[in-house]
Amino acid sequence: MTTPPPPSTTPLTYRDAGVDIDAGNALVERIKPLVKRTFRPEVMSGLGGFGALFNLAGKYKEPVLVSGTDGVGTKLKLAQQLNRHNTIGIDLVAMCVNDVLVQGAEPLFFLDYFATGKLDIDTATAVISGIALGCEQSGCALIGGETAEMPDMYPPGEYDLAGFCVAAVEKSQLLDGSQVREDDVLIGIASSGPHSNGYSLIRRIYERAGSPADLDIHGTRLIDTLMAPTALYVKPILKLLHTHSDAIHAMAHITGGGLTENIIRVIPPNLGLRIDANAWTQPPVFQWLQREGALADTEMWRTFNCGIGFVLVATPNQVAPLGQALDNQGLAHWQIGRVVTPVDNERVHIG
């Protein structure tokens, strides 16, 4: 029987095992001023507690809480390859707050999860600065989060992100699609680019094309277009709901599944959609992706937002005032289709 070797007399520390508590504490101190700028009057606690506190009293009569969680997909991989960490946090916030906005809810607070094999304070600070900026631009408080340093779990230089958002809406103003009627009009609001969806396919096309980062796409470098942060629709849409609530029957955030699979999620099961693909011109980056990837139209519609990041389902006689209100806020928009009775069980027709 083999005798086990005697235990080493060299003392070990958590840092020896790959976890640097001091680095984590230094990160917290670095991000505190960024986080504080996002706070709303309802925030009752600072960073560092076991739980973050938010006082909802007095703001709503019958509040309904709406929660959401998301990541940024493999756009994160591209950000890490390019060493661009300061805007991916905006994407993270947008993916969450735009989702809860669909039900007419105001984002209240946000929490993030940042996991890595070895904590790089500068990289983490850059990421969280983007998260804080996204929260500021959405009126949403960044009240907590988790930074997990997990040796051997991630390759050097890589990290993962997740976001969590809680929003609220008056029960009487909740948008759940139940008011949608045949002939309601679809108003598509412009995206800022691919947002945070379809990046596994985007990266494959980009690499197959020779990674042409500096390729001119309508006056912008291709890589800058691909890395443009996801548009934040919260403030303009909440303003629109305040002034035109009766005109909007439902809303949709165009994420994974594209135009084919997202708008239909808020449409009653007995109704369908007819979308006019000629109602707007797809931005050049989507034209490049389709050409370089030899993608069928159907693949484009169910993978990318194709230039439409958010959709309003509106009563027909209110389309003009809604359009004027969107113009006043500088949001490009188009009438892209209607709610219809399905033909031959085809609930979504794009043509």
Swiss-Prot record:
Presence of the UniProt keyword Nucleotide-binding in the record: yes
EC number(s) recorded for this UniProt protein: 6.3.3.1
Any one GO BP annotation for this protein: adenine biosynthetic process
Locations listed in the record: Cytoplasm
Enzyme class: ligase
Enzymatic reactions: 2-formamido-N(1)-(5-O-phospho-beta-D-ribosyl)acetamidine + ATP = 5-amino-1-(5-phospho-beta-D-ribosyl)imidazole + ADP + phosphate + H(+)
UniProt keyword annotations, A-Z: ATP-binding, Cytoplasm, Ligase, Nucleotide-binding, Purine biosynthesis
GO molecular function annotation: ATP binding; phosphoribosylamine-glycine ligase activity; phosphoribosylformylglycinamidine cyclo-ligase activity
PANTHER family: TRIFUNCTIONAL PURINE BIOSYNTHETIC PROTEIN ADENOSINE-3, TRIFUNCTIONAL PURINE BIOSYNTHETIC PROTEIN ADENOSINE-3-RELATED
UniProt-listed Pfam families: AIRS, AIRS_C
Pathway assignment: Purine metabolism; IMP biosynthesis via de novo pathway; 5-amino-1-(5-phospho-D-ribosyl)imidazole from N(2)-formyl-N(1)-(5-phospho-D-ribosyl)glycinamide: step 2/2
CDD domains: PurM (cd02196)
Record GO cellular component, one term: cytosol
UniProt family annotation: Belongs to the AIR synthase family.
Name listed for the protein in its UniProt record: Phosphoribosylformylglycinamidine cyclo-ligase
Database matches in InterPro entries: PurM-like_C_dom, PurM-like_C_sf, PurM-like_N, PurM-like_N_sf, PurM_cligase
Gene name of this polypeptide: purM
